[in-house]
Amino acid sequence: MRDQLWPGEADRLWHRRTEQGFSTIPRTLPLVMTLIDDLKGKGKDTSRVYLDLWCRQMDDSFVEVTDEDAFAYSCGYSTPGRNVRTWRERIDILRDMGFIGVRPNGSRRYGYILLYHPHKVVAEVQKSGKVSLEWWGAFAKRATEVGAVLEPPSAA
């Protein structure tokens, strides 16, 4: 179908099997990011930090924080002096929500990050009653479309 609608465009497209620099991410990630934004405080653009972490992991859910300035800039935090502080605040929010684990590396407080299975985290958040029925419906539909198996939701 694609080639019928865009003939001759194949050489302009990203092909994960022939390119370097790709990452495997859950197909439900946009909805998980929406939930993160729904649950965090106003003005705390946390979901793009979560996306950046997923793009940095190498299919092992593990990220070594090698340069906090570069991580912050990648997430859109470019103001010197505030960029790293803002990034760290968002990391703390993701940790407190249960989406990631954080461990130090020597004297560096944010040395390593572990990305937990987002569907398992979502199930825990849903059990706490913080997930809207609208979001859960959209998430369950998308998860079913991509073949993901979800824990049954708590009775509301």
Q: Can you annotate each of these PLM segments?
A:
Residues P118-A156:
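Short, amphipathic alpha-helical interaction segments positioned at domain boundaries
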Residues R56-I113:
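Winged helix-turn-helix DNA-binding recognition segment
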Residues R12-L13, R103-P104, G111-E124:
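Short, cationic/aromatic linear interface patches
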Residues M1-D69:
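Short recognition helix of helix-turn-helix/winged-helix DNA-binding domains
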Residues T18-T28, P80, V125-S132:
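Intrinsic-disorder-associated interaction segments
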